[in-house]
Amino acid sequence: MARSLKKGPFVDDHVMKKVLAAKAANDNKPIKTWSRRSMIIPEMIGLTFNVHNGKGFIPVYVTENHIGYKLGEFAPTRTFKGHKGSVQKKIGK
């Protein structure tokens, strides 16, 4: 179920403080965050976030197309190695 429009987008307070400080200082350093649940809002356009995926940090550059999504959607947490195949398929028959 989607979030109610009257509530507005959710952004963690510590992320919002860092965004406003980076915009005021015109700073291009990436903002390191573990807050995958924070929604991307228009104030974040042009900033780079290092989003934690459980193991490391994935750089996410925010553009206009990202507005309305969450930061965690752009930092995958799982790596797909492929389904197990037979030995003959790997050799090439």
UniProtKB/Swiss-Prot annotation:
An annotated Gene Ontology molecular function: structural constituent of ribosome
InterPro entries hit by this protein: Ribosomal_uS19, Ribosomal_uS19_bac-type, Ribosomal_uS19_CS, Ribosomal_uS19_SF
GO biological process, one term: translation
The keyword Ribosomal protein belongs to this UniProt entry's keyword annotation: yes
One GO cellular component term noted in the UniProt record for this chain: small ribosomal subunit
Segments crossing the lipid bilayer: none
Ubl conjugation as UniProt keyword: no
Keywords annotated in UniProt: Ribonucleoprotein, Ribosomal protein, RNA-binding, rRNA-binding
Gene3D superfamilies: 30s Ribosomal Protein S19, Chain A
Family: Belongs to the universal ribosomal protein uS19 family.
Biological function: Protein S19 forms a complex with S13 that binds strongly to the 16S ribosomal RNA.
Alphabetical list of PANTHER family matching this protein: RIBOSOMAL PROTEIN S19P FAMILY MEMBER, SMALL RIBOSOMAL SUBUNIT PROTEIN US19M
Protein name: Small ribosomal subunit protein uS19
